[in-house]
C-alpha cells in the first residue's frame, strides 16, 4: 500500500493536518486490508478504506462545504476519488469531535469513529476501554501504524 497520492495532498494544500490525516488514512488502509479494489461487508464497504455509503456521502458533503467537487460513489475504484473522499470524511469526523469537545483526537479515537461510525463511537464515549475487543484492537493497530 502506498501513502495517499501526492496529488491529493497538493489539492488539499499540504497543511500539517492534511499530512497527519494522510498518515492516519494510510494506516487505516493497511488495517482494512490494503487493496484499492476490495469490497467488504457484503459489498457495502468499498475500496482501500472500506467506506460504507454513509461515510462516502459524509465525505462528499464535507467536500461540498469546502467548495470542492464531490465524487459520485460509482467512481469508488478511482484512487483519487477514494483518497479525496476519505480525507474529507476524516476532516468531517475531526469537526464533529471538536464540536463534542475533543479538538485534538488521537489516531485511535479517529479510528474508532471510522470503524464504528461517529454515532457508534459516541455511544461508547469515544473510549477504547468501552469498545468491543475487535474494534479496540483495530483502533490500536491504526494508532501503532501512525506512530511508526
Question: Language model features by range: what are they?
Answer:
Residues 14-42, 50-148:
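Non-catalytic cell-wall polysaccharide-engagement segments
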Residues 1-2, 6-20:
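Bacterial Sec-dependent signal peptides at the C-terminal "C-region" and cleavage site
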Amino acid at each position: 500500500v502506498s501513502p495517499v497520492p501526492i496529488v491529493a495532498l497538493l489539492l488539499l494544500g499540504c497543511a500539517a493536518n492534511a499530512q497527519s490525516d494522510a498518515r492516519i488514512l494510510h494506516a487505516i488502509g493497511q488495517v482494512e486490508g490494503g487493496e484499492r479494489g476490495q469490497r467488504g461487508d457484503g459489498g457495502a464497504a468499498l475500496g482501500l478504506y472500506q467506506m460504507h455509503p454513509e461515510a462516502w456521502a459524509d465525505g462528499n458533503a464535507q467536500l461540498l462545504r469546502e467548495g470542492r467537487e464531490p465524487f459520485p460513489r460509482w467512481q469508488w475504484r478511482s484512487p483519487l476519488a477514494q483518497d479525496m473522499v476519505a480525507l474529507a470524511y476524516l476532516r468531517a469526523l475531526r469537526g464533529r469531535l471538536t464540536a463534542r469537545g475533543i479538538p485534538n483526537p488521537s489516531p485511535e479515537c479517529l479510528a474508532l469513529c471510522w470503524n464504528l461510525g461517529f454515532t457508534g463511537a459516541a455511544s461508547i464515549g469515544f473510549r477504547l476501554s468501552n469498545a468491543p475487543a475487535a474494534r479496540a484492537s483495530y483502533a490500536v493497530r491504526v494508532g501503532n501504524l501512525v506512530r511508526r
